[in-house]
């Protein structure tokens, strides 16, 4: 049981708080495509929206002080005990409180790089030291390197799985071997913010390790697949003992009544989660096809964002995209990469057009001509009134490009003649 007398707050120094921020300095209200925060473009579940509206009328009443209503629902959802769950104001608060509970002056935290840096910065702000282990050549977290970095001062190993910004997973077999080698007294924090998006069978959540006695703290959020980033609800899953230590440094009433209601409703709407995952898969393919067409290499993604090499300095490309209304992220000592979140179908198509424009302006030209003929892109996609269709012809040959309606009736012939090798654009006016 939580003791009110144990609640405390630890404030980071100003510089530490800025360094720990997960956000960019883009204008949050001025965009054509906000592709920098890995948000859910479908928005919240309709059930969550209704719950928000209903609960707004009770905004004059304090919330459940200790978030036990949401903790009970999460525990039931994941087949855990309520004392194995700690809810807070987004994963942001949870990460801070994990650091506050287990890291003090002289302690060490080990994490991967590139990765999500908040836990490391919270540790530094608490007087600890962060040790960074580079990811391997396949952009995967180097678990053996992390084991080799352990010292007598190590208190937390912080993993992000799937990783952000590299969007790669830790193989489930590698994770099992890794956890068996963790010395006593070290906690393994695993941030699973993007857990629901993963499709590969090589991945497994670390939640089952909670009941197996491993010293793991799994961190999750309602900000991503549930579409509640603005509601600020996150949670930790661990043993009752470790959860108690996290709760002992947590302030009460940090999550509002409407946010409680939205999280509870969203948790029950599996259809919305399924729709979100399906839309993400489609729109991620749109990005992958577009990047390939532009001759850009990207890192295969298991999440709702992709890291792509733009073949030039990323900063000016991001600025050029921002001028066209598209917000993306740069950094992580990857000077030629931008991180792009999946958005709506229209946002993906418009973004690819903008990216091509910026790259052409920057003097980055693609000389890649796919060896397989066919339609490379359609903007917008799906189209209705007007669109641009781009095709590739690898050799001299006759090309026939005909549009049919959904009943199979021919509506328009765009081209029916020989074309030279290369890339060709056609505009259909929708008439």
Regions found by a protein language model. Give the residues of each.
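N-terminal export signals
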Residues: 1-18
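PLP-dependent aminotransferase class I/II
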Residues: 45, 215-299
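Conserved PLP-binding catalytic core of the aspartate aminotransferase-like
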Residues: 135-137, 281, 290-324, 342
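Active-site pre-lysine segment of PLP-dependent enzymes
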Residues: 143-150, 165-188, 192-225
């Amino acid at each position: 049981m939580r003791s009110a007398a144990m609640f405390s707050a630890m404030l980071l120094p100003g510089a530490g708080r800025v360094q720990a921020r997960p956000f960019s300095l883009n204008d949050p209200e001025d965009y054509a495509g906000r592709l920098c925060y890995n948000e859910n473009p479908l928005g919240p579940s309709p059930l969550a929206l209704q719950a928000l509206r209903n609960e707004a009328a009770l905004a004059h009443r304090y919330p459940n002080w200790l978030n036990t209503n949401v903790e009970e629902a999460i525990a039931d959802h994941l087949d855990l005990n309520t004392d194995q769950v700690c809810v807070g104001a987004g994963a942001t608060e949870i990460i801070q409180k994990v650091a506050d509970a287990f890291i003090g002056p002289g302690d060490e935290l080990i994490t991967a790089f590139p990765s999500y840096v908040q836990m490391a910065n919270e540790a530094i702000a608490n007087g600890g030291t962060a040790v960074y282990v580079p990811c391997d050549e396949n952009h995967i977290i180097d678990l053996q390197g992390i084991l080799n970095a352990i010292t007598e001062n190590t208190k937390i190993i912080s993993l992000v799985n799937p990783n952000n910004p590299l969007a790669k997973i830790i193989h489930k077999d590698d994770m099992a071997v890794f956890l068996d080698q963790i010395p006593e007294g070290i906690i393994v924090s695993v941030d699973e913010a993007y857990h629901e998006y993963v499709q590969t069978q090589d991945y497994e959540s670390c939640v089952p390790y909670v009941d197996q006695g491993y010293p793991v703290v799994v961190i999750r959020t309602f900000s991503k697949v549930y579409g509640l980033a603005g509601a600020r609800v996150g949670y930790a899953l661990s043993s009752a003992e470790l959860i108690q230590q996290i709760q002992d440094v947590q302030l009460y009433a940090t999550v509002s009544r409407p946010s409680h209601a939205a999280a509870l409703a969203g948790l029950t709407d599996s259809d919305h989660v399924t729709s979100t995952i399906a839309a993400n898969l489609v729109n991620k393919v749109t990005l992958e096809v577009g990047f390939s067409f532009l001759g850009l290499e990207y890192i295969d993604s298991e999440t709702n964002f992709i890291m792509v090499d733009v073949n030039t300095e990323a900063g000016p490309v991001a600025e050029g995209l921002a001028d066209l209304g598209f917000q993306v992220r740069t950094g992580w000592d990857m000077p030629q990469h931008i991180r792009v979140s999946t958005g709506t179908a229209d946002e993906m198509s418009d973004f690819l057009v903008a990216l091509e424009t910026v790259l052409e302006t920057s003097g980055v030209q693609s000389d890649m001509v796919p060896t397989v003929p066919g339609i490379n892109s359609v903007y917008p996609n799906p189209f209705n009134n007007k669109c641009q269709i781009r095709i590739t012809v690898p050799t001299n040959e006759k090309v026939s490009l005909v549009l049919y309606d959904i009943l199979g009736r021919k509506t328009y012939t765009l081209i029916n003649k020989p074309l030279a090798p290369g890339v060709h654009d056609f505009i259909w006016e929708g008439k």
